[in-house]
């Protein structure tokens, strides 16, 4: 905030005499602001306009990052304090609003037959992961397996909702078919044989691997899977971190 020119507090104070007690402002800010820095912005706004309505908006185009962060003040604010906007490639806009809730990772074994969903990390950044979960997993139980990094993951007993407001914040989702202890060139045969035995004809890496190694390992997996012969049922699959190992999933 100190690097902003002009300083935000000075800028808003200069404009305050020309604005009503209930202003209509949109502050376009850096998406890299920390929670502490966002609180600083709120304190600046409160020092000038008191307890005015405010809504934080995170905007993403679905590449696993926050593209724009803005604070909507006064008449522009939503009825909820947090809002996540997803802009799809086809021009569709999905909105998720609510209050910030803290999510917790719950341990436990990874069971075959359950569903694993990798979500957009912007859900966590916006504090709306729980709001999304309440809509995504209405039936049966669900718990967060991971909440950090580029691939936050949810485990659920039933497939998640197919509504756009849910799916637009999903990277990939599938049913857990099997688990393996390691994903590497050394365990390539074990991995592909397990995937083939589970009925998967194609397997994509959705786990953290050295960027220099990932394309080579993916190509090796593709070649190995083709050796099992054509599959009339094209069942796409993926493998991702799960607990202390990895889960092979059939993509939904």
Predicted regions and their residues:
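SAM-dependent transferase fold signal centered on methyltransferase-like domains
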Residues: 1-252
């Amino acid at each position: 905030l100190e690097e902003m020119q002009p300083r935000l507090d000075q800028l808003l104070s200069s404009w305050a005499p020309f604005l009503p007690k209930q202003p209509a402002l949109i502050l376009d800010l850096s998406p890299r602001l920390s929670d502490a820095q966002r609180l600083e912005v709120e304190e600046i706004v409160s020092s000038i306009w008191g307890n005015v309505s405010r809504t934080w908006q995170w905007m993403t185009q679905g590449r696993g990052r926050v593209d724009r962060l803005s604070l909507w003040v006064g008449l522009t604010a939503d009825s909820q304090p947090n809002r996540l906007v997803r802009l799809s490639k086809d021009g569709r806009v999905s909105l998720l609003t609510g209050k910030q809730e803290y999510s917790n990772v719950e341990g436990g074994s990874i069971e075959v037959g359950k569903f694993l969903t990798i979500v957009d990390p912007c859900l966590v950044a916006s504090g709306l992961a729980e709001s999304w979960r309440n809509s995504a997993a209405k039936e049966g139980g669900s718990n967060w397996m991971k909440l950090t990094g580029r691939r936050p993951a949810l485990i659920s007993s039933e497939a998640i909702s197919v509504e756009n407001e849910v799916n637009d914040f999903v990277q990939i989702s599938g049913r857990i078919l099997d688990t393996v202890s390691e994903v590497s060139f050394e365990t390539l045969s074990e991995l592909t044989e397990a995937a083939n035995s589970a009925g998967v004809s194609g397997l994509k890496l959705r786990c953290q691997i050295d960027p220099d190694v990932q394309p080579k390992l993916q190509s090796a997996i593709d070649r190995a899977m083709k050796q099992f012969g054509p599959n009339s049922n094209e069942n796409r699959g993926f493998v991702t971190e799960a607990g202390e190992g990895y889960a092979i999933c059939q993509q939904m």
